[in-house]
């Protein structure tokens, strides 16, 4: 089955995203988990999510795709930025459990002078810290353009990140 949808605004809540997609004729959608240029996230309201899940069932929706904010950088050189980003990643993965079977897409980040190898190790470490192996979300690493100190500029770098995951994290 092929599902087609759009990237919709999450500003009015989960059910509103679903209704907007139905109005557009789609049967899936992508959305940002939080402010794409910041770190703040709205509180999740159980009843809002339940109404979305009902709408998705009624309209035969496929899996959803959530996109992490662009500011998340789990391999940042500055420890405070890296810690904040890892906490954001943890929170986003936790939040994705409200939408079983969804995909969570994020840009690996920028090593900012540490070198690609260090960046790859930090990204794998962040994922190992955030993934329990019991979550239902599928995590997608998005390729980067490769400018500056971006990590994930090639499939080889993405493979190295995945190789750095603990075995039980990959078996889910």
Predicted segments, located by residue:
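Acidic/histidine-rich catalytic cores of soluble enzymes
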Residues: 29, 124-172
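Alpha-helix N-cap and loop-to-helix initiation/capping positions
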Residues: 40-48, 76-88, 114-125, 149-160
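Histidine-centered active-site/metal-ligand motif
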Residues: 7, 67, 107, 111
